[in-house]
Amino acid sequence: MKVTFEQLKEAFNRVLLARGVAAETADACAEMFARTTESGVYSHGVNRFPRFIQQLDNGDIIPDARPQRITSLGAIEQWDAQRAIGNLTAKKMMDRAIELASDHGIGLVALRNANHWMRGGSYGWQAAEKGYIGICWTNSIAVMPPWGSKECRIGTNPLIVAIPSSPITMIDMSMSMFSYGMLEVNRLAGRELPVDGGFDDEGNLTKEPGVIEKNRRILPMGYWKGSGLSIVLDMIATLLSDGASVAEVTQENSDEYGVSQIFIAIEVDKLIDGATRDAKLQRIMDFVTTAERADENVAIRLPGHEFTRLRDENRRNGITVDDSVWAKIQAL
């Protein structure tokens, strides 16, 4: 089915207000969920909203909490999220990293006791729109087996890097081949994954999203490389925030909350003039996209360049929402 941005935001807002969330907070949160969905990231927008409400109802998310700064070391700050709403807190932390970068050239905010930030790419994009390089990542509950294991002991720990090119170039990737959100998107659409995304119950690689969702044997990106990168990202976020690691979140909490996150902004224009910056970025993009195609009918893509197109298409044609997901939201 198709809905407008306004219908989507109103539905989110209604559910939040019904749970006693302050009007200003509810409006800002609903706006972010709707913008994420409008950008084509359904897995962490509309599809994720019922799960967000479940955690709100369970008390994992504290909607009236206010993040507090704990430590300030010039370009580096440490904050405690107080388990406030994840996407609103993450937006505030990247804003703070940008403020620090405007003073120091680089700003780093380490956040502990945070909630799921929904679409991590929103915060990298936020920095790049203002002319900064944006880098951020989060740890999570253990939802992926380390390479060589059957048992979930590491997080998908998504990493975002956004570059202020024109258009913005951005990677937003979990350390698994597919996020659990994308497994859901493909399952709901009745599609196999385009490449292997995990293991079946017999230990064979599989493209069946429903099987992987059920047995939790999701495949690390790049096999042992994604497994290793997940571990070191967890270590850095834990140390800099003095927060909870994947092990602590998994073993000590009843669900995925109280995670640790990193937000970095770099002011490129302190290091290079604008014309030179743009020329260098354009040369990189042209060099990549003019490579000989493996399939003449399939263009070579640059990461993140599709989001502006998807947003514009959704604004023109309406936003596609799975019927079962919309029914869940209407019933909340």
Swiss-Prot record:
**One cellular component (GO) term of this entry:** cytoplasm
- Reactions accelerated catalytically: 3-dehydro-L-gulonate + NAD(+) = 2,3-dioxo-L-gulonate + NADH + H(+); 3-dehydro-L-gulonate + NADP(+) = 2,3-dioxo-L-gulonate + NADPH + H(+)
| InterPro entries tied to this protein | Diketo_gul_Rdtase, Mal/L-sulf/L-lact_DH-like_ah, Mal/L-sulf/L-lact_DH-like_NADP, Mal/L-sulfo/L-lacto_DH-like_sf, Malate/L-lactate_DH-like
Catalytic center residues? H44 (proton donor)
- What keywords were assigned to this record? Cytoplasm, NAD, Oxidoreductase
Q: What is its main location?
A: cytoplasm
Which EC number(s) does the record attach to this protein? 1.1.1.130
In the record, what terms sit under GO molecular function?
Answer: 3-dehydro-L-gulonate 2-dehydrogenase activity; NAD+ binding
Question: Subunit arrangement?
Answer: Homodimer.
Recorded hits in NCBIfam families, A to Z, give:
PRK13260.1 (NF009750)
Which family does the UniProt entry place this protein in? Answer: Belongs to the LDH2/MDH2 oxidoreductase family. DlgD subfamily.
Q: What is this protein called?
A: 2,3-diketo-L-gulonate reductase
Classification lineage: Bacteria, Pseudomonadati, Pseudomonadota, Gammaproteobacteria, Enterobacterales
